[in-house]
């Protein structure tokens, strides 16, 4: 199942005022990726940061995507905030609307949506939330690509309702037997070479090792590298270098499709 083309995405613009999450290396990471998930103000991001990040993406030729989260600035969107369905719909519309206007102002379009943190993980296992999310996107723009894991309720609902979907592989996260990511405590930074080898194996062989030491099949359209992972820049460089050295093209889904490469056949 060797891949000839793959997307490389990262969360960008995750700060607020003078505050930054991670190493603050958005400018260095942006040219290495093909899709940027831009924080839209509720877990991180403010008007100045959003504008700057959209411009960075435009300058680098990187696809712009919205990265909406729960209304949880203090907890960085990692807390499951109890909201009514209508309030959550309004929050998502608000965040996407903000990014789309900044994108329009800078002469680019929003190509995808990737929920952040607790919203992403809760939707992955919650059918009602996934359906609400997908139906909201369909009303806003049925062509928006939704990023999610294949081993998730979100993926199933998106396919059922006909929303374009981009399946993710997490380079800097561990996997469980069911193909979903698990969160484990690590001492120190990830080794860039090991991360690059993990990505290459997934791209070439379609396999990934789980935290239990077993191998499972994995398929995906996009590789996610978190910009707030310690040493994120080194991980991004090693991953990109490994992919290009093995002849695997890095391209956003819209670019791949424009060149006749279907995402599910890349």
Swiss-Prot record:
CDD domains: LamB_YcsF_like_2
Disulfide bonds, paired cysteine numbers: none
Keyword Phosphoprotein: no
Keywords annotated in UniProt: ATP-binding, Hydrolase, Nucleotide-binding
UniProt record, GO biological process: carbohydrate metabolic process
Family matches, as InterPro entries: Glyco_hydro/deAcase_b/a-brl, LamB/YcsF/PxpA-like
Pfam families (alphabetical): LamB_YcsF (PF03746)
Family: Belongs to the LamB/PxpA family.
Assembly mode: Forms a complex composed of PxpA, PxpB and PxpC.
Protein name, as recorded: 5-oxoprolinase subunit A 2
Gene: pxpA2
